[in-house]
Amino acid sequence: MPNLLEKTRKITSILQRSVDSLDAELPYNAMASRLADIIDCNACIINGGGTLLGYAMKYKTNNDRVEEFFEAKQFPDSYVKAASRVYDTEANLPVENELTIFPIESKNTYPDGLTTIAPIYGGGMRLGSLIIWRNDKKFLDEDLILVEISSTVVGIQLLNLQTENLEETIRKQTAVNMAINTLSYSEMKAVAAILGELDGNEGRLTASVIADRIGITRSVIVNALRKLESAGIIESRSLGMKGTYLKVINEGIFDKLKEF
């Protein structure tokens, strides 16, 4: 049976994972699953707004309402507000407590259900909450030590993810600005007309038709598309007589065109 040191090492090894390996839809499912296995419980991670970032159900609660929260990836506002008032780990909360993960209709089914909630901090900010629960087994001091370590590890990963997202946003904005600065007025006009033809972020267009409609030459459109593609703003593929297939991969171009 793993001792406390071995369990701690398993938790801290999570930090060795790259942010790029996180799933976009539920980025912390794997992390919640590992914590659930190590601490022997169910676990979920929510951000400050109550959005579910990841969860692991090692032991089924047999409650449709709780599972609906997970499917919707959003916790009720009342629970989120109550959780935000937890500044230190609250352990072994009974089913009567407002912070229990067990809804009122399951109190008779799981009368001994216990919930532990730990705040997640990072960079001096409250980033979310780590919630773990068991149907009938108390969390001991060793478990709570692991919870404290886990919340710190999750906080570091959340900060890493936020930093990565911010850097990616800045990179995309910079790419758009640089691309726009290379366009002439006519090319900018062409880009606005082209993207206006798309169905969402992608679609088929015919350059000659657009050129005739806005009163520019086809070569202006071709040059504009080439500049955007070289900047990583769009992807294009010739469809021969049917025109050109276009896909926008940097959506920041749409915001920039609103200023045009």
UniProtKB/Swiss-Prot annotation:
Region (GAF domain): 1-159
Xref: CDD domains: HTH_ARSR (cd00090)
GO CC terms in record: cytoplasm
GO molecular function terms noted in the UniProt entry: DNA binding; DNA-binding transcription factor activity; GTP binding
DNA-binding region: 207-226
Alphabetized Gene3D superfamilies for the sequence: 3.30.450.40, Winged helix-like DNA-binding domain superfamily/Winged helix DNA-binding domain
Domain of life: Bacteria
Compartments, record wording: Cytoplasm
Transmembrane segment boundaries: none
Record keywords, A-Z: Cytoplasm, DNA-binding, Repressor, Transcription, Transcription regulation
GO BP: negative regulation of DNA-templated transcription
UniProt cross-references to InterPro entries, sorted A to Z: ArsR-like_HTH, CodY, GAF-like_dom_sf, GTP_trans_reg_CodY_C, Transc_reg_CodY_N, WH-like_DNA-bd_sf, WH_DNA-bd_sf
NCBIfam families tied to this protein: codY_Gpos, PRK04158.1
Family: Belongs to the CodY family.
PANTHER family cross-referenced by the UniProt entry: GLOBAL TRANSCRIPTIONAL REGULATOR CODY, GTP-SENSING TRANSCRIPTIONAL PLEIOTROPIC REPRESSOR CODY
Summary of the function given for this chain in its UniProt record: DNA-binding global transcriptional regulator which is involved in the adaptive response to starvation and acts by directly or indirectly controlling the expression of numerous genes in response to nutrient availability. During rapid exponential growth, CodY is highly active and represses genes whose products allow adaptation to nutrient depletion.
Protein name: Global transcriptional regulator CodY
